[in-house]
Amino acid sequence: MAFDTMTAPPPAGGKWVRCTGPQLRKMARAGLLWLEQNRDHVNSLNVFPVPDGDTGTNMLLTMRSAYARIELSEETHVGKVAGQIAQGALMGARGNSGVILSQIWRGFAAGLANKEAFLAADLAQAFQGASDTAYKGVMRPVEGTILTVIREGAAEAADAARKSDDLRFMLERVLERCQQALERTPELLPILRQAGVVDSGGQGLVYIFEGMLRYAQGKLSLDGQQVAVAPAGEAVSAQALAVPEGGSLEFPYDVQFILTGRNLNVHEVRARIDAMGDSTVVVGDDRVIKVHIHVKDPGQPLTYGISLGHISDVVVENMQEQMEELVHGGAAPLASAAGAPPAVAP
């Protein structure tokens, strides 16, 4: 029997063929909650691009910002809900992983822009858009990361759509494929193999998808009740961390900000910012651009941004200090910024 009511995922055993805006909102909350439950595990895997132990925190802050845009919304149009999620993720994106996650949501939303509700074929298209947009947002895409995980997940979504119109079936297949891709990340990225871990950003994305599926299966409550936490596994030891020879990072400062202006050229901004350091992710449009980069001099990208318009949500983190905290057994400092979104209440 098909199940397509406005506000709830399918009951156990039901076939789910149509997803509405309220359903997507609940799934986004489920993904956020499951990531929140497993943030420490994601942080413990963080060795690339810098072993600063904050990937889980950055992805969580990004998801909180995304969900804050829709938490009280009564919108039923699934394309508009997806667009709100994407906008919230972009504005609140933290760190390299958070900005890439925002681009996954951006591509996902673009694929659903004109949909009142989505079917399996629409969801497969959205997954492909998520993968394509994420790759385009990174100056030099690296395999063995969150990019690989979303790309393989998108491929599986397309195959699942050809076999069934059941959305839950697709989510099950996508999660399984993403988990398999995650397990193979050490084969693609030597730094992960050296540390004996899978990619932290990819793991964070898997947790988000797992939360969504658990809710669709009726295995995850959104009413504030305690939920089971996935096994955390072992944290990366200080000896296994990919600490640069000599202990110093070439680009020790993580700089993030939002640039707003008129007639901005995102391609030109990306090229200029990229010349200042590495781990560049610059995304947006002619009015709003999100900038993330690792640099020697944090003043350089900030000054450039000011020359083009107005900068806000500025975050500057000393990754050298974060790395040393991890190496010496301390906890990595949490990402911080003025106006960071609050935790989602149960």
Listing of model-derived features with the role each one plays in the protein:
Residues 1-346:
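N-terminal loops that bind phosphate or other acidic moieties
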